[in-house]
Amino acid sequence: MELSVAMYGLLCLLFSQAVPMCVPTDYTLYEERRECDFCVAINTTICMGFCYSRDSNMKELAGPRFLIQRGCTYDQVEYRTVILPGCPLHANPLFTYPVALSCHCGTCNTDSDECAHKASSGDGARCSKPLRHIYPYPGLNSYIHPN
């Protein structure tokens, strides 16, 4: 009995490394420009999940080899551009946003990715103007243009 419990625990420990914990996840961006008439909800995917990290509390003795800081970040990303509806002629109606195609656990590349989490205000308000939805599939409306 004890052996089967130990084997089950070992299998769970080994299997947890094979289960993807960092995956593309559906997310809605809200873009509102002062000069345009509408707030736009854009459905996309972002990288979200948990990655193994370790930070020793004895860095002075152990050195950097015990410091492992990884986050869930883009492996492959595609950028798409939408035309924001209700913008006047003098305003640029184009908005480009990332779509996560695949993700991995690794260090964040600050040259190309946003690596810090921005806290929301918590009031639940996303838009102050009327809302329009932009869909990720080009056939659903005429506002999206793939790059």
UniProtKB/Swiss-Prot annotation:
One protein family per Pfam: Cys_knot
Against Gene3D superfamilies, the record matches this protein to: Cystine-knot cytokines
Cystines in this chain: C22-C72, C36-C87, C39-C127, C47-C103, C51-C105, C108-C115
Q: What InterPro entries does the record point to?
A: Cystine-knot_cytokine, Glyco_hormone_CN, Gonadotropin_bsu, Gonadotropin_bsu_CS
Signal peptide feature range = 1-20
In which tissues does this protein get expressed?
A: Pituitary gland. Higher levels seen in immature fishes than the mature fishes.
| Subunit (UniProt) | Heterodimer of a common alpha chain and a unique beta chain which confers biological specificity to thyrotropin, lutropin, follitropin and gonadotropin.
Of the GO CC terms on this record, one is: extracellular space
Where is this protein primarily located? secreted
Q: Which UniProt keywords apply?
A: Disulfide bond, Glycoprotein, Hormone, Secreted, Signal
Q: What does this protein do?
A: Indispensable for the control of thyroid structure and metabolism. May play some role in the biological processes of the immature fishes.
Which residues does the annotation flag as glycosylated? N43
**What family, per the record?**
Belongs to the glycoprotein hormones subunit beta family.
UniProt-annotated location(s):
Secreted
Question: Can you say what this protein is called?
Answer: Thyrotropin subunit beta
The molecular function terms in GO held by this entry are: hormone activity
- Extract the PROSITE patterns matched here: GLYCO_HORMONE_BETA_1, GLYCO_HORMONE_BETA_2
GO terms of biological process kind: G protein-coupled receptor signaling pathway
Superkingdom of the organism of origin: Eukaryota
